[in-house]
Amino acid sequence: MLVEFWADWCPPCKMIAPILEEIAAEYRDRLTVGKINGDEHTDIVTRYGVMGFPTMNLYRDGEVVHRIVGARSKRRLLAELADHF
């Protein structure tokens, strides 16, 4: 599962949102994509050590196996995730 931590006021979050929607649709058989509003869920942000938005955590068996901080192009994001799913 890929979880994006985001905020309404975050321009890079708005930029990456459609990319994550595309990835969720294209890889739905192998990857679940979710979003957590960091301003509304500060306890979760703190628990996972999120220091900026957007942050995307890739989870396997409940553990973070990869973290990406900042917006990426679709190609670059998929390249960073390729070894994990």
Regions found by a protein language model. Name each.
Residues F5, K35-I36, I68:
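Structural motif
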Residues R47-M51:
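A short glycine-leucine-enriched loop at secondary-structure breakpoints
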Residues G52, N57-F85:
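Non-catalytic, surface beta->alpha helical segment in thiol-disulfide oxidoreductase systems
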